[in-house]
């Protein structure tokens, strides 16, 4: 299975490294698409070492391949972990300020978002509305009880 692992810019980004390792050990091909803020928590070298592939961050890299469209279309699954409140809001609004946003808009496969944020942010009416809208559109929002860790369902 070809998986795009989007990584949001929250402290839980380091846990996505474990998720990536589990995906690759299970035999999946994984392309990591971190946000700029995610790279502040976990560097590109870590993602590349664990995936065996170059990290994708630039919408305009590999323009001849239409990188921002190809990644979303070729994936069998897109997982975003952690999905910060900001990333949930941008996704719900259909915004694509970076490569990950473009991938989410062009994905024709199942999309799973794993929220990770402080409880106050999770319960904010804007976040609640964004999650409801995403679910209405068919996006799976996998919820943990602490919202600071990646949902256990993603590690299975």
Give residue ranges: language-model regions:
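Glycine-rich oxoanion-binding loops at beta->alpha junctions
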Residues: 45-90
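A short, gly/pro- and small-residue-rich
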Residues: 93-107
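Glycine-rich phosphate/diphosphate-binding loop of Rossmann-like nucleotide-binding domains
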Residues: 1-46
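General beta-strand structural signal in soluble alpha/beta enzymes
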Residues: 32-34, 57, 80-81, 113-114, ...
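Conserved small/polar residues in nucleotide/adenosyl-binding loops
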Residues: 146-152
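Glycine/threonine-rich flexible loop motifs
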Residues: 85-96, 121-124
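Short, glycine-/small-residue-rich phosphate/pyrophosphate-handling segment
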Residues: 108-144
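Residues at the C-terminal ends
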Residues: 25-27, 106, 136
């Amino acid at each position: 299975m070809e998986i795009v692992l989007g990584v949001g810019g929250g402290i839980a980004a380091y846990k996505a490294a474990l998720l990536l390792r589990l995906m690759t050990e299970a035999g999946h091909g994984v392309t990591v698409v971190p946000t700029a803020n995610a790279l502040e928590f976990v560097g590109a070298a870590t993602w590349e070492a664990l995936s065996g592939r170059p990290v994708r961050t630039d919408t305009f890299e590999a323009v001849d391949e239409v990188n921002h469209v190809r990644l979303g279309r070729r994936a069998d699954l897109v997982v975003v972990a952690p999905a910060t409140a900001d990333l949930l809001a941008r996704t719900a609004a259909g915004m694509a300020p970076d490569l990950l946003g473009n991938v989410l808009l062009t994905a024709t496969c199942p999309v799973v978002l794993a929220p990770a944020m402080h409880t106050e942010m999770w319960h904010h009416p804007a976040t609640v509305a964004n999650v409801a809208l995403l679910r209405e559109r068919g996006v799976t929002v996998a919820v943990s009880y602490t919202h600071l860790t990646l949902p256990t369902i993603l590690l299975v």
